[in-house]
Amino acid sequence: MPLVVLDPLPVEIESLLERRRRLGLDGGDEMWDGVLHVNPGPHGRHHRIQQQLAEMLGPPALAAGLIPAMGAFNIGEKNNYRVPDGGLHRPGPDELFYSTAALAVEIVSPGDETWKKLPFYAAHGVDEVLIVDPLERVVHWLGLQDGEYQWIEHSALIDYGPTQLAKRINWSELPADEVGKVSDG
């Protein structure tokens, strides 16, 4: 349910946001052109997928000279940033707000804004976006070409592709819906 509260924020909203900050519940919140998007914590299936991705993507990322970061980080700047579920970085300094990433990883949650982030990622030069949907058991791998994302069969960054990844994910750890599949767009 979207909710827009115009400035100045009521004391109750300020109190809620401060409480979320204090308790560390705001880690997945995002700022979209100055508009705060308050996101709930992810479902348990999200963490199981995230751990598998860390184990599968880490070795080929390191072999390619990239830095695996399977956990939330900020892409953008203070008043306009997105928080992917993980990614791969090129070597460089650690930052609070990264200007880009080699790869952004998104794990879809019901009703989230994963697909709406693509224009932002493109504008920030994120080379590839890996989207895993645990409910649909689908892996999408997109590469940035001429300012837009296109489905790709193999990463240009690491020795992996969506078909290979979908076959390696242990979907059986998740609620039984469908057998793992790959989206071709």
What are these regions (language model features)?
Residues 1-185:
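Gly/Pro/Ser/Thr-rich low-complexity, intrinsically disordered segments predominantly at protein N-termini
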